């Protein structure tokens, strides 16, 4: 995307010209080489997972980001690969719930981000991100609702099928978090465009802490 068009992104080092493209390219190549060599020495599967993340990121930057629906699926799949890489490096079982849960949460967040960008940039949205000319607010709202529902269903099924039988009592707290984030997207909060800013929303932060504490207690019962 053309960050120079986006009022929130044009002050970034590359977009503003503070860091020159050749230096950024050199730094990227250096860090990539060091990272992949380090990953290969640690674990072969970890190496190939990181390589997959890099390849998908490159394909996304080259053309996947311009294709309707493929853009959000590619981003979400990359999040799944990151989670798998983490599971591999700490040598834990890669649960199907981990894969499906993270995939749909990523779709939920990415769709919300697209909605926020479309709402914020209006007629300039397609100049910033070409794929936005294909998306409409009603379409993104529908997708957002679908993914929100799927996330709740997945967590509910996971809770009922879990060996921790009391975990089902955490469902209402989880639903609140999804609904709160849904509200932030619908109200055109900056969090829609920048999910990392979710920590600035006090109800969401408090709700998350309560959910984590309740879940830990229920798992220990």
Predicted regions and their residues:
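Interfacial loop-to-transmembrane junctions
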Residues: 20, 182-210
């Amino acid at each position: 995307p053309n960050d120079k068009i986006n009022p929130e992104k044009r002050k970034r080092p590359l977009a503003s010209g503070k860091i020159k493209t050749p230096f950024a390219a050199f730094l990227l190549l250096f860090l990539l080489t060091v990272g992949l060599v380090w990953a290969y020495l640690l674990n072969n599967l970890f190496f190939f997972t990181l390589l997959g993340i890099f390849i998908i990121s490159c394909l996304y930057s080259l053309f996947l980001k311009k294709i309707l629906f493929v853009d959000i699926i590619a981003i979400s799949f990359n999040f799944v690969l990151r989670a798998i890489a983490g599971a591999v490096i700490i040598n834990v079982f890669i649960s199907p719930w981990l894969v499906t849960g993270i995939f749909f949460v990523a779709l939920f967040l990415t769709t919300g981000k697209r909605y926020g960008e479309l709402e914020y940039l209006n007629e300039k949205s397609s100049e910033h991100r070409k794929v936005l000319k294909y998306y409409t607010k009603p379409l993104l709202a529908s997708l957002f609702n679908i993914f929100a529902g799927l996330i709740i269903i997945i967590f509910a099924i996971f809770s009922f099928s879990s060996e921790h039988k009391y975990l089902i009592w955490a469902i209402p707290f989880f639903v609140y978090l999804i609904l709160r984030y849904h509200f932030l997207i619908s109200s055109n909060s900056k969090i829609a465009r920048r999910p990392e800013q979710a920590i600035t929303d006090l109800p969401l932060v408090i709700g998350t802490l309560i959910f984590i504490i309740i879940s830990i207690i229920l798992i220990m019962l």
